[in-house]
Amino acid sequence: MMKQYYIGVMSGTSLDGVDLALMDFTLNPPKLMATDFTPMPEKIREKLTALLRSGETSLRNLGEIDHQLGLLYAESINRFLQKVRLKSEDICAVGCHGQTVWHSPNCEFPFTMQIGDMNLVAAKTGITTVGDFRRKDMALGGQGAPLVPAFHQDLFFAAERLTVVLNIGGISNISVLEENCPTVGYDVSVGNALLDSWIELHQGKRYDKDALWAKNGKISTALLTDLLAEPFFQQAPPKSTGRELFNLAWLNKKLEKFTALSQPMPSPQDVQRTLVEFTALSIANELKKLQKSDRTNLLLVCGGGARNPLIMQRLTALLAEWQVSTTSEFGLDIDYVEAAAFAWLAYRRIHNLPSNLPSVTGAKSEVSLGVIFPK
């Protein structure tokens, strides 16, 4: 039987780099065969950070970043192929998410924008590429996110338990898998985005490795209470969010209240510890609404946040009724779940199979997501 190899490519809101996953769909369930990671080049990262913080740029700058990302994705794929000793003709298709620079599903003119020229990816790799996964769902009245729960359902559903897959990337989202219930999935809170932005601002580091900085900070109860008062947490699912809400400007507005009220300002380290608590507590608050008393509650954590020992420790402590684990313990590397999902989405698009879940996104109907860019 000819191998059904697909490559998934993902660069998320954390801007750390490009994740690549090789999936074999001749197997059921599909198997993760190999992974790779390309760090985000500093110049591209700086441009993206500036764009995401301001939400404004020139058309020329946007076009240049779009081109640069397309080349980066293509080069990353070609290096990956060399690493796993495969040729472009061995791959059925690439599923490339692109880089989200704006996601606004609830405004008068809803739109989402992912950049990274897929024409370049297809041309430079010689592999049919599927991209632009979110806009068809939004055209059908959906949120365009999250898209990964359908993949989680395929891999992790088990009738005897409630399973929740929690991805802690830049933003935290969940997939809720339960017998006799439609799968639902939605964004629940911030993930690493604020933690990474804050430590970069104050320590010049990309992220807080092993939460070493946060561990020695103290929780500011006043700040934590204000962060948890964000109206997003009161919205009913399905819902989605991103850096356009949870960013340094949002955090600084909260901190400015301390000055306005003549209260002592928390130290940068205390803010970092408070952000960890905010992340864990806002996630746990949502999960407690879902837990069952008559069966096992299993939480499978993936994404960069699963490597943060303080977040994992706090989730375990806050969720006494849950078995807290990671996707790695169930066969899918915590760092490559989303990349693997976009390989799955590409497979579904090439075979014209539905890949959104209206119960998740709120779309009017099922549809095969993505635009095909021939090689």
From Swiss-Prot:
Any single biological process term in GO: amino sugar metabolic process
Molecular function, one GO term: phosphotransferase activity, alcohol group as acceptor
UniProt cross-references to Gene3D superfamilies, sorted A to Z: 3.30.420.40
Listed pathway(s): Amino-sugar metabolism; 1,6-anhydro-N-acetylmuramate degradation; Cell wall biogenesis; peptidoglycan recycling
Binding locations of ATP: G12, T13, S14, L15, D16, G17, V18, D19
Coiled coil: none
SUPFAM superfamilies: Actin-like ATPase domain
Record keywords: ATP-binding, Carbohydrate metabolism, Kinase, Nucleotide-binding, Transferase
EC code: 2.7.1.170
Source species, domain of life: Bacteria
Catalytic activity line of the entry: 1,6-anhydro-N-acetyl-beta-muramate + ATP + H2O = N-acetyl-D-muramate 6-phosphate + ADP + H(+)
Enzyme class: transferase
Pfam families per record: AnmK
Family: Belongs to the anhydro-N-acetylmuramic acid kinase family.
Function: Catalyzes the specific phosphorylation of 1,6-anhydro-N-acetylmuramic acid (anhMurNAc) with the simultaneous cleavage of the 1,6-anhydro ring, generating MurNAc-6-P. Is required for the utilization of anhMurNAc either imported from the medium or derived from its own cell wall murein, and thus plays a role in cell wall recycling.
Protein name in UniProt: Anhydro-N-acetylmuramic acid kinase
Native source species: Mannheimia succiniciproducens (strain KCTC 0769BP / MBEL55E)
